[in-house]
Amino acid sequence: MEEELKLFIQVWVSAIISVTYCYYLTPKIKTSLLRLLSVLPVCVLFLIIPIFFSTVHSSFTIAFFLSGLAVPKLILFALEKGPLFPLPPNLPHFVCFACFPIKLQKKPNPENTNHFPKWVFALKVFIFGALLLQAYHYKQFLSTNFLLGLYALHIYLELEISLTLIKFLVSITLGCDLEPQFNEPYLATSLHDFWGHRWNLMVSKILWLAVYNPIRQWRAKSSEWDRFFAIFATFLVSGVAHEILYFYLTREKPTWEVTWFFVLHGFCMAAEVALKRKTKLVQRWPVNPAVSRLLTVGFVFVTGVWLFSPQPIRHGLMERFINEDLFLIDFFNRKLYILLGLFTSL
């Protein structure tokens, strides 16, 4: 564990140095091709380093933050696009915006504004730490379907809690408002609402800038088929990216199940958008929000169990995530008891 922590620190020091190089050198290069070539060594480094970790939390964090987000951000930056362009006002801002899944909130977006009180986040932390993780102690008594539901809840809560805490700390450090990463995805009323406005919003924005927009701008007069293809291609790229993420975590040959999950969702979302744009059925016979939420979340859950979950379950990833979470909680509890003992003895 100590060696893993040392490696984790070394990687982040290397990442900061690499991003600092991009901050000072890349903007001074005039042509897009040379700027792109200047950031490629950093991108290659970020794509390689997740392989050197043994714990799934370390591998996932580095793969998600650096391989999955920092790489496309830097490529877009070299092309004078994306969240790093125009150049942030100083180096700390550039490093944070490049290395963390955050984005400066320039204008409040009503679609992404979370109107829920802060106690809702505290409730999620309680559910995750006090209920969900403890329920795994009794998993031998739980049905397979119930356990799959717990796994889905685990992925969502751990992602939202960790990313919200990072956003909070970076926001305080930089003294600026940041956009939310999640917007209560369980309230989504359609696939477009789920993927476009509620789930992992930083990733959605990067995919929009890196894949969807270039395809739509490729032709001067875009048609509905171009829109359909752009949506489908965006989900296909997301599927391949998740397949690479699974490789980092499992070190096993890809099975492409998770890619088919995103291919299916890309096709369904593209069809949904086309149906809403070309027909007036939705306006004439609107679906009750409660029903549409149930159908949307149900579709995501069922297809997730079918195509998204088999790989992590087959390779024991969820078991490793759970064991590491329980170990970390036990570690911090022991440290807390030691500190409390020191204070009470004074």
Swiss-Prot record:
<comment type="similarity">
    <text>Belongs to the wax synthase family.</text>
</comment>
<feature type="transmembrane region" description="Helical">
    <location>
        <begin position="7"/>
        <end position="27"/>
    </location>
</feature>
<dbReference type="GO" id="GO:0016020">
    <property type="term" value="C:membrane"/>
</dbReference>
<feature type="transmembrane region" description="Helical">
    <location>
        <begin position="59"/>
        <end position="79"/>
    </location>
</feature>
<dbReference type="InterPro" id="IPR032805">
    <property type="entry name" value="Wax_synthase_dom"/>
</dbReference>
<keyword id="KW-0012">Acyltransferase</keyword>
<feature type="transmembrane region" description="Helical">
    <location>
        <begin position="228"/>
        <end position="248"/>
    </location>
</feature>
<keyword id="KW-0443">Lipid metabolism</keyword>
<keyword id="KW-0812">Transmembrane</keyword>
<feature type="transmembrane region" description="Helical">
    <location>
        <begin position="36"/>
        <end position="56"/>
    </location>
</feature>
<dbReference type="InterPro" id="IPR017088">
    <property type="entry name" value="Wax_synthase_Magnoliopsida"/>
</dbReference>
<keyword id="KW-0444">Lipid biosynthesis</keyword>
<keyword id="KW-0808">Transferase</keyword>
<feature type="transmembrane region" description="Helical">
    <location>
        <begin position="116"/>
        <end position="136"/>
    </location>
</feature>
<protein>
    <recommendedName>
        <fullName>Probable long-chain-alcohol O-fatty-acyltransferase 6</fullName>
        <ecNumber>2.3.1.75</ecNumber>
    </recommendedName>
</protein>
<feature type="transmembrane region" description="Helical">
    <location>
        <begin position="289"/>
        <end position="309"/>
    </location>
</feature>
<dbReference type="GO" id="GO:0009579">
    <property type="term" value="C:thylakoid"/>
</dbReference>
<dbReference type="InterPro" id="IPR044851">
    <property type="entry name" value="Wax_synthase"/>
</dbReference>
<dbReference type="GO" id="GO:0006629">
    <property type="term" value="P:lipid metabolic process"/>
</dbReference>
<feature type="transmembrane region" description="Helical">
    <location>
        <begin position="146"/>
        <end position="166"/>
    </location>
</feature>
<dbReference type="Pfam" id="PF13813">
    <property type="entry name" value="MBOAT_2"/>
</dbReference>
<keyword id="KW-0472">Membrane</keyword>
<comment type="function">
    <text>Catalyzes the final step in the synthesis of long-chain linear esters (waxes).</text>
</comment>
<dbReference type="GO" id="GO:0047196">
    <property type="term" value="F:long-chain-alcohol O-fatty-acyltransferase activity"/>
</dbReference>
<feature type="transmembrane region" description="Helical">
    <location>
        <begin position="255"/>
        <end position="275"/>
    </location>
</feature>
<keyword id="KW-1133">Transmembrane helix</keyword>
